[in-house]
């Protein structure tokens, strides 16, 4: 009889201890939410294929088709298109700021747009307003020129030297 009481006491103590452990390990009630284990880095937008940073530049340029930079371009920054996503909540985007020589930019325009690189100086200035361009401050770009793509835009400063390649997408 003593053995059965001892077994009962051990079983009861073990059960109580397990119940307490379970309660402690689940400190969140039913209504609480726990942070997602797959939280995105601050430089990656929801639905975007990769973070917006220099380390992922090649992956970003490979999105869609035909994205590249002028020959010999130096990339100054790669940032997420934050303002664009305010206008298009399911969208994501990248802003690639670069510098390149005048001849390289002209050749790039001729090869990658429907415009001639030789005539872009005569084209009118672009104006803000398109949601694809909402991340750029046009007050800081002299004589901006723009060419649109199906999934982005190219904005150049004149005289030529600085540019921004914008790549946009949607998680739909």
Task: Name each model feature, range by range.
Residues 1-4:
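N-terminal secretory signal peptides that target proteins for export/translocation
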Residues 8-9:
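N-terminal export leaders
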Residues 20-23:
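C-terminal motif of bacterial Sec signal peptides marking the signal peptidase cleavage site
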Residues 30-96, 100-101:
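Extracytoplasmic low-complexity, Pro/Thr/Ser/Ala/Gly-rich segments
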Residues 95, 105-172:
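Extracytosolic low-complexity repeat regions of secreted or lipid-anchored proteins
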